[in-house]
A protein has these predicted regions:
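Intrinsically disordered, low-complexity boundary segments flanking structured domains
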Residues: 44, 48, 134, 220-221
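Short C-terminal domain-edge/linker segments immediately following a structured domain
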Residues: 79-80, 132-137, 266-268
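Serine residues within intrinsically disordered or low-complexity segments
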Residues: 2-3, 7-9, 17
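Generic structural signal of hydrophobic/aromatic residues within well-ordered alpha-helices
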Residues: 19, 76, 106, 114, ...
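C-terminal, charged low-complexity interaction regions
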Residues: 6-10, 164-303
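An N-terminal structural lobe/cap that precedes and organizes the functional/catalytic core
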Residues: 11-113
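Catalytic cores of phosphodiester-bond-cleaving enzymes
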Residues: 32-40, 90-159
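Low-complexity, polar-biased intrinsically disordered regions enriched in Pro/Ser/Thr/Gly
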Residues: 80-89, 130, 200-212
C-alpha cells in the first residue's frame, strides 16, 4: 500500500478535515435500517457468525482502536429502527458501543485479526489529505472482509437480526465475503449536524429483487448495507440464492464514485475515486440510488 502524487483531480478530495476537524469532543453517529419479516431474531446466546451457543462476547461496532486517533470525548448515537418507531438516542464515547453477539473464538481471534489487518489501510485513508492511497488485491480483500464484518455487526444494533443467516455462515466458513455479494469503496465528507460531527453512519435495507424475462419472473431476497466511517464509505450489495441470478451494475455515474473491492476487478485501485459521494448526498443519497442488474439466469431455462 502506497501513495501516488496528488493530481489536479484530487483537489475536490482534500482530506485535511479528516484529522483537523474531527478531533472535537462531541460527535454523532447514526445507524438505521429497515426490518424484514423474512428474518427471525437469532436466539440469544447464539454466535452471529458461526452459530455456536454459549457465553457471548461484546463486539465493537467500530473498532476501539479509533479512540487512539483522538475520538475519545462525549458522543451521541442515534438508532433509527425501520419499523417507524421512535429513534433511540444513546450517550457515550463515539466508538465505545458494543453488541454482545459473538463467541470468544470469533471475536478474539477471527474478527480481531480482520480489525488489525484493516487498521493501517483505514488510517492511511483517514490521513490521505488530498493524496491517493494505492490498494493492491491483497489490500482490497482485507478491506472487503472488514467491511462485510462491520456491516453485519452494525445491522444487529436494534436486535432485529436482518442480515441474512446464509451469508453470515458462508463468510465464517470461507473467510471471504459471500459469493453473491459485491462490495465497493468510496469517499464522502463528514457532515456537521445539529448534534455535532457525524463521525460514522450505517444503513441496512433488506429488499426483494425480481428478474423478469419473457413474461416469467423470479423473486429473491436482496439487501444493501452502506456505511461511512469518517471519510471512507463502503457499499455492500448481496442476494441470497443457490445459483447466480444477477450481475449488479452500479451505473455509470456511481462507477466514478465507487471502486470495486469484492470480487476484485483490478490488480490495483487508488482511493479516493475521482468523484466524491457528496455529489449525491453521501450515504443517504447512495442508499436511495437505483440498483440495476443484468440477469444471469433466464426463468424457466438455462443461464
Amino acid at each position: 500500500m502506497s501513495s501516488r502524487p496528488k493530481s489536479p483531480s484530487d483537489d475536490e478530495h482534500d482530506m485535511r478535515s479528516a484529522i483537523a476537524v474531527m478531533t472535537a469532543d462531541y460527535c454523532y453517529l447514526t445507524m438505521s435500517h429497515k426490518r424484514s419479516p423474512r428474518h427471525q431474531a437469532t436466539p440469544s446466546r447464539t454466535c452471529l457468525f458461526c452459530g455456536a451457543t454459549g457465553p457471548l462476547n461484546g463486539e465493537h461496532i467500530y473498532g476501539d482502536w479509533l479512540r487512539n486517533l483522538g475520538f475519545t470525548g462525549e458522543g451521541v448515537r442515534e438508532i433509527v429502527p425501520g419499523d417507524g418507531s421512535q429513534p433511540i438516542i444513546q450517550r457515550g464515547g463515539p466508538f465505545s458501543k458494543k453488541l454482545k453477539i459473538v463467541c470468544y473464538p470469533c471475536n478474539n481471534q477471527w474478527m480481531s485479526g480482520m480489525e488489525t489487518a484493516a487498521q493501517p489501510m483505514l488510517t492511511a485513508m483517514f490521513n490521505a489529505r488530498g493524496s491517493s492511497v494505492e490498494l493492491d488485491q491483497a489490500a482490497q480483500l482485507t478491506l472487503a472482509r472488514w467491511a462485510f464484518k462491520t456491516a453485519a455487526v452494525a445491522a444487529q444494533v436494534d436486535r432485529s437480526d436482518p442480515f441474512p443467516l446464509p451469508h453470515r455462515r458462508e463468510f465464517r466458513q470461507t473467510d471471504q465475503p459471500p459469493h453473491h455479494v459485491q462490495i465497493r469503496i468510496g469517499a464522502a465528507s463528514i457532515p456537521m449536524l445539529q448534534r455535532g460531527e457525524q463521525l460514522a453512519e450505517s444503513r441496512f435495507e433488506p429488499r426483494t429483487a425480481t428478474i423478469t424475462y419473457a413474461g416469467q419472473s423470479i423473486s429473491f431476497p436482496f439487501y444493501r448495507a452502506s456505511f461511512r466511517l469518517l471519510t471512507v464509505v463502503f457499499d455492500i450489495l448481496g442476494y441470497v440464492a443457490e445459483t447466480d441470478l444477477v450481475d449488479i451494475d452500479p451505473g455509470e455515474d456511481l462507477k466514478r464514485a465507487l471502486l470495486p473491492l469484492w470480487p476484485p476487478e483490478h490488480p490495483r485501485i487508488w482511493w479516493p475515486p475521482v468523484t466524491s459521494l457528496d455529489v449525491i448526498g453521501g450515504v443517504p443519497g447512495l442508499t436511495a440510488s437505483p440498483i440495476v442488474g443484468v440477469p444471469m439466469l433466464v426463468p424457466g431455462g438455462q443461464g
